[in-house]
């Protein structure tokens, strides 16, 4: 109840505190569970370029390696969305907005795939903003700009028609996307990780806000398929552990606009 109140009435500090706490807890677990050492062995074998998935070739920098980097490196991260990304990456966009960018896997990965499109990466955690800048420099993506808190006022002032919006902001998604019905939303493609556990009712709120302008795909998380690598010094069990995400159940909405700017 307190967390829901904070996200509703104090979204800027609430999201910053939640993001920072979550990142510190995640980094601590990576070491406690032995995943940091497994990741280091995998990096020593395969290097620091992503070898699979929609963002193959992406360079993973030093700060990113504080995370459980195995799923990113192997291309198994959020593999439930791979088919979605295969379709999304075929479309033209005028702008890409990533809210809750973490270390920049999606923001910089998308910037490489759309080098002429401006990418704005938001994260309220100072560590994440630093990591995104490092990733953007290493991957030579000057089209990435990094910001802190994203709110409805920024969307109202800066969102362009035919944008791609990627949202993973720990319950802030309802306020960000539903508080102001913006014309630019009607032509945006959105990939939204839902956080019903933080803000009950946010799923229904987003559906109600966009059901007249978008088609919906609802994606549920599933177990990651372990990667098989040839000539690896890691055992099958180690490869399973290093390729799987440590997470609970997740759900995403993928919203596709029913019209394009040319049809308006």
Model feature map: region roles:
Residues 95, 101-103, 129, 144-205:
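Active-site segment flanking the S-adenosylmethionine/decSAM binding pocket
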Residues 1-122, 127-135, 139, 143, ...:
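S-adenosyl-L-methionine
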Residues 139, 184-186, 209:
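Residue-level signature of transmembrane alpha-helix interfaces in integral membrane proteins
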Residues 207-220:
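Conserved Class I S-adenosyl-L-methionine
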Residues 115, 186, 212-215:
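Proline-centered flexible-loop/turn and helix-kink motifs
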């Amino acid at each position: 109840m307190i967390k829901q109140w904070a996200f509703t009435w104090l979204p800027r500090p609430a999201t910053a505190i939640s993001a920072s706490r979550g990142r510190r807890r995640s980094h601590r677990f990576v070491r406690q569970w032995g995943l940091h050492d497994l990741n280091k062995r995998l990096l020593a074998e395969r290097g620091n370029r992503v070898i699979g998935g929609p963002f193959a070739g992406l360079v993973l920098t030093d700060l990113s390696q504080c995370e459980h980097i195995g799923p990113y490196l192997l291309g198994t991260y959020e593999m439930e969305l791979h088919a979605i990304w295969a379709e999304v990456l075929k479309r033209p966009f005028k702008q890409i907005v990533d809210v809750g960018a973490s270390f920049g896997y999606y923001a910089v990965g998308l910037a490489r795939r759309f080098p002429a499109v401006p990418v704005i990466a938001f994260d309220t955690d100072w560590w994440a903003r630093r990591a995104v800048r490092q990733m953007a420099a290493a991957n030579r993506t000057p089209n990435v700009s990094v910001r802190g808190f994203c709110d409805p006022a920024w969307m109202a002032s800066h969102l362009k028609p035919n944008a791609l919006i990627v949202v993973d902001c720990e319950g802030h998604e309802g306020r960000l996307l539903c508080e102001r019905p913006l014309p630019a939303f009607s032509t945006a493609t959105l990939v939204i990780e839902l956080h019903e556990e933080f803000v009950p009712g946010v799923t229904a709120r987003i559906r109600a806000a966009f059901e007249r302008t978008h088609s919906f795909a609802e994606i549920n998380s599933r177990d990651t398929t372990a990667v098989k690598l040839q000539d690896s010094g890691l055992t099958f069990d180690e490869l399973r552990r290093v390729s799987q995400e440590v997470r609970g159940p997740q759900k995403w909405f993928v919203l596709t606009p029913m019209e394009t700017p040319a049809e308006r």
